């Protein structure tokens, strides 16, 4: 699947540098406590060795597995890390944390990957929009609970509006949101910022190139969106 992604993304993304990728599987003893998948960021002095861990207990369909590898690998975290490094980004960036950029980019590319899976275009669009809608619900509940102070009843009523009435399911979702306030916003809001930036710059530039847009983002590297948009706009002129 990674090999397919590496080939398919070349229509929309610049070619990545050569690197080694090891796919590892989470030990069953830890599967209950770890994310569905995660990328171990390569050290700055050895960017050529990369690892992606897959939690088999939380992957149940081929398309889920495919888009997860896109999020963590190509053109997601791994790809962004090695490309930004190959473009000569200052090493000090590794000390800074811009989760809206890193997780927003990975989510943005995950959404793109539905169209690289060989699915019927209408089905790919449906699955992509369903994934985006699901993330939007989690992000809205995150804001509701941690900013507006939703009580249990208000939170349950929110999920019920969207057909989620099972008490155990609502509790599981709520527990995830309570564990890390604001966590879902870096994924969903970050994703929206990249989409909005792409749409806006495409309107401004008649010769807009998606691949050049992505390259400008990667060359800039993790940064605040206010800085990123200005820098990308300058690079596309």
Language-model segments: residues:
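Long, His/Glu/Asp-enriched segments that create or flank divalent metal/ion-associated functional microenvironments
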Residues: 1-237
């Amino acid at each position: 699947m990674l090999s397919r992604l590496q080939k398919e993304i070349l229509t929309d993304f610049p070619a990545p540098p050569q690197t080694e990728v090891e796919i590892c599987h989470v030990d069953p003893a830890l599967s209950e406590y770890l994310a569905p998948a995660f990328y171990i960021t390569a050290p700055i002095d050895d960017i050529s060795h990369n690892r992606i861990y897959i939690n088999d207990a939380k992957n149940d369909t081929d398309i889920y597995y495919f888009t997860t590898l896109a999020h963590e690998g190509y053109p997601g975290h791994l790809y962004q890390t090695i490309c930004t490094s190959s473009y000569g980004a200052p090493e000090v960036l590794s000390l800074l944390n811009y989760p809206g950029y890193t997780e927003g980019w990975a989510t943005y590319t995950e959404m793109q990957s539905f169209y690289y899976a060989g699915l019927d275009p209408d089905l790919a669009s449906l699955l992509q929009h369903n994934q985006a809608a699901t993330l939007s619900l989690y992000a809205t509940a995150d804001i509701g609970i941690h900013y507006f102070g939703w009580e249990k009843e208000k939170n349950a009523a929110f999920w019920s509006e969207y057909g989620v009435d099972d008490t155990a399911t609502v509790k599981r979702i709520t527990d995830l949101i309570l564990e890390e306030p604001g966590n879902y916003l870096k994924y969903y809001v970050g994703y929206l910022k990249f989409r909005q930036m792409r749409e806006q710059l495409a309107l401004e530039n008649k010769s807009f190139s998606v691949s050049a847009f992505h390259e400008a983002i990667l060359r800039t590297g993790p940064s605040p969106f206010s800085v990123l948009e200005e820098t990308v706009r300058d690079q596309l002129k």
